[in-house]
């Protein structure tokens, strides 16, 4: 296609008196996936000026012991640098020459008859953002020829187990450790093309959630909910789900990744629907929890929903570049503890005491969220969340909380990225989920938390039993971090808007998708809303919505509402001794003490706890039962053993244990 000299054309037409109609026809798409741009970003992260990157695509294969083809799912690292969603392909990038080469299989007649043909070299060159196309059978020859001409340069592959077909002699020159971290750093920051696809996936999934809300009163089984959601997505050309849908009703919602989706809805209070589609390989991840009728079935269900919604809104409000995500995870636990204390589920302690014991994990056991992109749990683990080059401004912003303050509520096995102790700060272009939840897992409560003296003293059994039928509540949105704050890409309704849709039975316009709302902190800065200057948080951070209990001394001074006593007394123990208390005066201390004494916090005290059979089944009086999982449990156990006259005994749980 010839290049149009627009400048020269405009100069010539300037002297003409007639009007001209210019018709342009493009032979290729203007909206190609930016594979070449991604390749250059990876090279910049590798920090090398010469070398070769090799990535294999996913081969076509059959199901095990079957002649039926397995569902094809392209390898995400390969796709990130190629934009090619065809099987049996390979990719090579010559770093010094800046040449991106795609290798595709030859077209075979039997493949065309049964499965249709793939792209020809000319079609692939027009379709993908690449420089050259060759057939796969030429891969070994081309790489060997390149290696012969570049004797002292490295070849980069993704994994130590990866190999280049026909190039085993090149193994001493292969670097299998540098490429994946470099690609992960690139994949965490989404470009405009990627954001467009994630937004589209969110729009389709949000419409599917609306359809479910509008029809939920008609349905009798979880399978119908799953079926409708997938039907809406497929009809909008989003044929792949980012993960297996979770349509959990009643107690099933207490299982985080429940996927049976086959139980009747009769007698259940709530449905937790966690489902999101893929659009052109990019994922969405949305959760809505809603009643199965036109109103809240119980006050307990409404209370838990409102608490989870408050947890989510409090955390989303603070998302912007420079914020440490783990701080928001901690904050979500503190909001949860406040709410559970008010409801009487937690008791006999302050927020600080309950937090330090880790008891809130009985009800909020997972991380606040994760990256989302080509994978629903996208790249961004601990070693990849370090402060990036070129972002020195964040290096001077420490965590909002003291070192290791996350220990009681963080578990590396269950809290996925970016909720990680080594996480640094959110950056513009990241897309993360915010998905707090409150769950009532009967198994976890009976087998760990209630038998443990560390946790059981804070749990009111009588009140807890009233909340067990709720099952669980989770609310999840996908959030884009922008230069000025954040944008919520998820448009599925929540709260009153959600209830109205259930009552009306109308999902809204199905052909025109509702645009995503945009939130900008710079726009909000024009009003007189007071702002914070807490360590680790930008000066543009808005004042939170928290209203902590009067006696709780768990949040920094800056996180108290202004119409409350905006200070923390200097007397007594505090986890925040490093924080300044500029507003603390003797007069305010006296006011705080008077208010504390005149309006004491009413905490529900449990009646005599029901006797529980220990997990091991041993009820002998001289056997001391202690249940441990964290470092704090072990420390408490050591103190308990040292101060008691009895000797802790381990008892086998079954005959097999006795043999061992």
Swiss-Prot record:
- Which Cys pairs are S-S linked? none
UniProt KW keywords: Aminopeptidase, Hydrolase, Manganese, Metal-binding, Metalloprotease, Protease
Q: Which SMART domains match?
A: AMP_N (SM01011)
Q: Does the keyword Amino-acid biosynthesis apply?
A: no
Has keyword Manganese?
yes
- Pfam family example for this protein? AMP_N
Residue ranges crossing the lipid bilayer per the database entry? none
Record note on cofactor: Binds 2 manganese ions per subunit.
- GO: which molecular function terms? manganese ion binding; metalloaminopeptidase activity
* Residues at which Mn(2+) 2 binds: 274, 285, 476
InterPro entries to which the protein is assigned, alphabetical: Aminopep_P_N, Creatin/AminoP/Spt16_N, Creatinase/aminopeptidase-like, Pept_M24, Peptidase_M24B_aminopep-P_CS, X-Pro_dipept-like
Q: Which parts of the sequence are annotated with region: Disordered?
A: 641-660
Reaction catalysed by this enzyme: Release of any N-terminal amino acid, including proline, that is linked to proline, even from a dipeptide or tripeptide
- Cofactor(s) listed in the protein's UniProt record: Mn(2+)
One biological process term from GO is: proteolysis
EC id:
3.4.11.9
What residues bind Mn(2+) 1, as annotated? 285, 435, 476
Q: What does this protein do?
A: Catalyzes the removal of a penultimate prolyl residue from the N-termini of peptides.
Write out the similarity annotation.
Answer: Belongs to the peptidase M24B family.
Protein name, per record:
Probable Xaa-Pro aminopeptidase PTRG_10574
Q: What is the lineage of its organism?
A: Eukaryota, Fungi, Dikarya, Ascomycota, Pezizomycotina
């Amino acid at each position: 296609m010839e290049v149009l000299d627009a400048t020269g054309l405009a100069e010539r037409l300037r002297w003409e008196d007639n009007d001209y109609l210019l018709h342009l026809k493009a032979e290729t798409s203007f909206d190609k996936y930016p594979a070449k741009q991604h390749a250059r970003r990876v090279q910049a992260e590798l920090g090398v000026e010469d070398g070769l990157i090799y990535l294999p695509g996913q081969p076509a294969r059959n199901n095990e012991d079957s002649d039926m083809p397995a569902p094809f799912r392209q390898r995400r690292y390969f796709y990130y640098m190629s934009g090619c969603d065809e099987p049996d392909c390979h990719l090579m990038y010559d770093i010094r020459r800046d040449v991106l080469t795609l290798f595709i299989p030859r077209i075979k007649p039997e493949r065309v008859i049964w499965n249709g043909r793939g792209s020809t070299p000319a079609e692939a060159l027009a379709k993908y953002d690449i420089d050259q196309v060759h057939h796969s059978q030429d891969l070994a020859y081309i790489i060997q020829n390149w290696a012969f001409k570049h004797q002292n340069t490295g070849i980069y592959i993704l994994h130590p187990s990866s190999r280049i077909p026909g190039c085993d002699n090149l193994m001493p020159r292969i670097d299998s450790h540098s490429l994946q971290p470099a690609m992960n750093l690139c994949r965490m920051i989404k470009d405009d093309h990627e954001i467009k696809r994630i937004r589209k996936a969110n729009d389709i999934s949000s419409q599917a959630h609306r359809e479910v809300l509008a029809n939920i009163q008609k349905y009798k089984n979880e399978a119908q909910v799953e079926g409708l959601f997938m039907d809406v997505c497929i009809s909008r050309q989003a044929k792949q789900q980012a993960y297996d849908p979770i349509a959990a009703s009643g107690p099933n919602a207490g299982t985080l990744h429940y996927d049976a989706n086959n139980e009747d809805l009769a007698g259940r209070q709530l449905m937790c629907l966690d489902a999101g589609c893929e659009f052109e390989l990019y994922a969405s991840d949305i959760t809505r929890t809603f009643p199965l009728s036109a109103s809240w079935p119980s006050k307990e269900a409404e209370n838990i929903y409102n608490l989870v919604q408050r947890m989510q809104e409090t955390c989303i409000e603070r998302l912007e570049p420079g914020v440490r995500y783990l701080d928001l995870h901690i904050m979500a636990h503190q909001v949860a503890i406040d709410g559970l204390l008010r409801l009487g589920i937690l008791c006999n302690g302050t927020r600080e005491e309950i937090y330090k014991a880790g008891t809130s994990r009985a009800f909020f056991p997972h991380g606040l969220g994760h990256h989302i992109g080509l994978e629903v749990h996208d790249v961004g683990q601990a070693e990849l969340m370090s402060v990036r080059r070129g972002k020195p401004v964040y290096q001077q912003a420490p965590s909002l909380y003291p070192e290791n303050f996350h220990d009681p509520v963080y578990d590396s096995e269950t809290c996925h990225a970016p909720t990680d102790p080594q996480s640094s700060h959110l950056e513009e272009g990241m897309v993360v989920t915010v998905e707090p939840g409150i769950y009532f897992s009967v198994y976890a409560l009976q087998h760990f938390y209630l038998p443990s003296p560390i946790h059981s003293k804070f749990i009111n059994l009588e009140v807890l039993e009233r909340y067990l039928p709720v099952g669980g509540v989770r609310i999840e949105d996908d959030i884009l971090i922008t230069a000025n704050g954040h944008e919520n890409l998820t448009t599925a309704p929540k709260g009153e808007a959600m209830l109205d849709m259930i009552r009306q039975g109308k999902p809204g316009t199905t052909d025109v998708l509702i645009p995503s709302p945009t939130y900008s902190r710079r726009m909000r800065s024009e009003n007189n809303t007071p702002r914070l200057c807490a360590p680790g948080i930008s000066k543009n951070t808005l004042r939170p919505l928290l209203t902590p209990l009067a006696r709780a001394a768990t949040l920094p001074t800056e996180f108290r509402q202004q119409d409350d006593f905006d200070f923390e007394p200097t007397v007594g123990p505090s986890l925040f001794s490093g924080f300044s208390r500029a507003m603390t005066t003797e007069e305010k201390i006296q006011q705080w003490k008077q208010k504390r004494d005149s309006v004491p916090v009413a905490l529900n005290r449990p009646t005599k706890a029901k006797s529980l059979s220990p997990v091991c089944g041993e009820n002998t009086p001289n056997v001391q039962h202690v249940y441990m999982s964290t470092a704090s449990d072990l420390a408490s156990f050591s103190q308990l053993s040292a101060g008691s006259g009895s000797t802790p005994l381990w008892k086998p749980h079954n005959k097999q244990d006795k043999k061992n």
